[in-house]
Structures are given as C-alpha cells and as structure tokens.
Amino acid sequence: MKTISNKEYSGERPLFGKSNIKLSNIRIIDGESALKEGHEIGAEKSYFNGKYPFWHIQDLSIDTCAFDTMARAAIWYSQKINMSNCDVVAPKMFRKCSDIRVYQTIFSDAKETFWDCKGIKIDNCSMNNADYLFLNSSNIEINKLKLNGNYAFQNASGIKIVDSIINSKDAFWEAQDVTVINSIINSEYLAWHSKNVTLINCTITGKQPMCYAENLRLVDCILADSTEFAFEYSSVFATIKSHIESVRNPLSGHIRATSIGKIIIDEHKKAPATCVIEENYFG
C-alpha cells in the first residue's frame, strides 16, 4: 500500500481512481470529489474541507481525521467503512452506504446523516443538530450514543440501541423491529405508526407517546409526568415503574403501572378495545 504524506490538495478530483493508498497528514482544502471510484483507502490525521471526498469507495478506513463545514456529503455510495476518533462538522455524512463502523466520533452537524444505509454499528459517539438521522436505514446496532435532533430513525428497521440518550421529536416514526435498552428517550410523539418496538428499562419523556403502534412492548420503563395521552390506538404490553399522566383508548394488550392519573376510554375508542389496565405495579 502506497502512503501519501504531508500533502495539500484542492480543485476537482485530485486523487480520482486511486486505490491501495494510505493518506497521512494530508489536507483537502477545497474543491470536490477528491477521491472517487477507489478501493482499499486509508486516511489518518488528515483534514477535509472539499465536497464529496469519498464517493463510490470500497474498503475505507478513516482515523483521527477532521471533516470541516464544506466537506458535506462526504461518504456516499460506499461499502465497508471504518471511522474512528474523528471530528465531523459537515452535514449529510453517509448516504446509500453499507457495512459501516463508527467509533468514538463527534458529529457536530449530523442532519440528514445515515440515509438509506445498511449494516451500521455505532459505539461511543455523539450526534448533534441531527434532524432526520438514520432515515430509511436498516440493521443498526448502537451503543452509548448521545443524539440531539428531531425525526430520528424514521422508517428505519432492525435497530438495537443500548445505554444511549435520544433527544428527538417524532423519533421512530414508522420504524420496525426496534429494541432499546437502558436508555433515556426524550421525544414528543414517540414511535407513532411503528411496529414491533420493545423498550426495556428506559426512561421516557414527551407528550402523546407511542400511539398507533403495533405490537409495542415496554418492560419496567419509567414515564415522566409529561407523557400524557399515551398508547392511543396501540396494541401494547407494558410494565411501567412509575406514574402515567394519562392513557387514552389503547386497542389491546395489558398495561400495568404504579399509578395512572387518568384512564380515557371514550366514544372514540376503536375495536377491539380489550386492553387490560392495572395500577399498583412497582417492578
């Protein structure tokens, strides 16, 4: 593998088609498509500020690099990607990629990141300004993520999240096959129109959570006082180790909580309307 060190590039396609190379302490200061249509590319201790630097790349390893504001849409249409210890300021990172591993990386402007991607593993990362994160993506494993941004995981599937903090309005809308464990979720209108969502030992805040959900399961979770009108038109099995402000017209299942401020079963209920609701559950 050839090593390219201590170089500075600008303009369009300065390293187009290069393969089997390692970039060390290089700077892409402007331009676009610095590397494209290559394979087996490594980058370390380098700086990117040109658009679209890594498109159509097979086998990409990036460590201790910085992606500045203009390095937007940096990695698209690529496979087998490993990123670690990076600082990403640019938005729209990762689109239509597969087999992605990201470790200990900070995304300061993560909006529209991880769209239409498959096979994602995230460990010990933070993602801010992250609106529409993981849209339409699948097979996602996450450990220790701090996420700030709305509409995360919309229409995503095959998701497992552990020990994370998710601050995201409308998170998990139309998502399928989701498991979240030991995490904090702050989300208005959480998981509406979702299917097969399981939350275990989670703390949940946000109004009108988990409505129109199919096969929703909560195991020993805590719902904050703001979670009013929960579970409307959802099939749900839930054990809640806290007070619930109100529950409204669940479809079916079984809800057990420490206490419930208001149980609303009114003329707007929908069949089968068979959900069993119990209080005095303490876990």
Where are these regions (language model features)?
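Long, distal/terminal scaffolding or interaction modules
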Residues: 1-283
